[in-house]
């Protein structure tokens, strides 16, 4: 059984084909980073137009990579939300149209469920139950996961997501878009302890996050200490350490409250090597395990949508004839399978 996955929720066009027996057969990705770089962030209209240009050619490339024809596809999965409405509509319209033309089911997929299940693509996938840390440019959430669709929100950011805070602080440091990965690279040259940033909301009970204050703290620190190269690196180090420590503290609390021994980290920020190392160290001390996808499957991609689509397809989920997307879509609303 083979599922074609289409991801167009933001600024990456991702197409993949997943086979339930052979695994991932094809994975095509086009990033719009250069398109949006001059604007310092994603421009929704430009993103939508570029998805229109790239989606069908990438589908053709994926079929060629897998050595398949359209008649070999058993279902088409597409990201139906959350995300940018225009971008979502491109993928949903193409996916629904292909499914109709090929006479196969169309499977709407939740973008964050795709991220959550991305570690399942690895050779050592996690077993249920586990705590999931979904951490990206648009989301920072802690989820109790006891099965597919059995998701309980434990905590989330009340303002900026962690990835958003990375990008905004990187901009303050004069780094180009997308700044998060560049900030992490700069932090490697920083001196630990020269600056100490707060660990927001760790001094009170609960599992919610708040990262907007760190951006303000960074701006004030830059203003007070100048902008020479080493100072900028030291500030980047202090900022990253604060975010990583905050995420680690909240993950530890979530594991303690649930009693689970497994932690899954997913989303674009899960590619951060400092975060991976800190969480791995924490889980080793707790005699637990941490799981995450390979770096190319941490950011938006079609493989996670194809896999999540396969899981939902086997459970009997299909789309109605119309094209519907949900720019805002709580993960907890998904049905269990």
From Swiss-Prot:
It catalyses: L-threonylcarbamoyladenylate + adenosine(37) in tRNA = N(6)-L-threonylcarbamoyladenosine(37) in tRNA + AMP + H(+). SUPFAM superfamilies: Actin-like ATPase domain (SSF53067). GO terms for cellular component: cytoplasm. Fe cation binds at residues 111, 115, 300. It is an enzyme of class 2 (transferase). One of its GO terms (biological process) is tRNA threonylcarbamoyladenosine modification. Substrate binds at residues 134-138, 167, 180, 272. Belongs to the KAE1 / TsaD family. This is tRNA N6-adenosine threonylcarbamoyltransferase. The lineage of its organism: Bacteria, Pseudomonadati, Pseudomonadota, Gammaproteobacteria, Enterobacterales. The gene is tsaD.
């Amino acid at each position: 059984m083979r599922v074609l996955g289409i991801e167009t929720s933001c600024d990456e066009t991702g197409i993949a084909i997943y086979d339930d027996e052979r695994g991932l057969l094809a994975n095509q990705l086009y990033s719009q980073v250069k398109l949006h770089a001059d604007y310092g962030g994603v421009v929704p209209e430009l993103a939508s137009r570029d998805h229109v240009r790239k989606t069908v050619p990438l589908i053709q490339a994926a079929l060629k990579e897998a050595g398949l024809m359209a008649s070999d596809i058993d279902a088409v999965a597409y990201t139906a939300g959350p995300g940018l409405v225009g971008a979502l509509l491109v993928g949903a319209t193409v996916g629904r149209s292909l499914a109709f033309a090929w006479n196969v089911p169309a499977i709407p997929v939740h973008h964050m469920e795709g991220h959550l299940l991305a570690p399942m693509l690895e050779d050592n996938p996690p077993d249920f139950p586990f705590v999931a840390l979904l951490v990206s440019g648009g989301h920072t959430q802690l989820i109790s996961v006891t099965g597919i669709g059995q998701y309980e929100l434990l905590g989330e950011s009340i303002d900026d997501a962690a990835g958003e805070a990375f990008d905004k602080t990187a901009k303050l440091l004069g780094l180009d878009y997308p700044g998060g990965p560049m900030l992490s690279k700069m932090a490697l040259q920083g001196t630990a302890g020269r600056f100490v940033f707060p660990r927001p909301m760790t001094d009170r009970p609960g599992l919610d996050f708040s990262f907007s204050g760190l951006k303000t703290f960074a701006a004030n620190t830059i203003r007070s200490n100048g902008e020479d190269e080493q100072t900028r690196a030291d500030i980047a180090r202090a900022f990253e350490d604060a975010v990583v420590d905050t995420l680690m503290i909240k993950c530890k609390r979530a594991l303690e409250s649930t009693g689970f021994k497994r932690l899954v980290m997913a989303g674009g920020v899960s590619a951060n090597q400092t975060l991976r190392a800190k969480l791995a160290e924490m889980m080793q001390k707790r005699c637990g395990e941490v799981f995450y996808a390979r770096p190319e499957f941490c950011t938006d991609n079609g493989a996670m949508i194809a896999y999540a689509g396969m899981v939902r397809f086997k459970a009997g989920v299909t789309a109605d004839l119309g094209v519907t997307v949900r720019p805002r879509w709580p993960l907890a609303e998904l049905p269990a399978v």
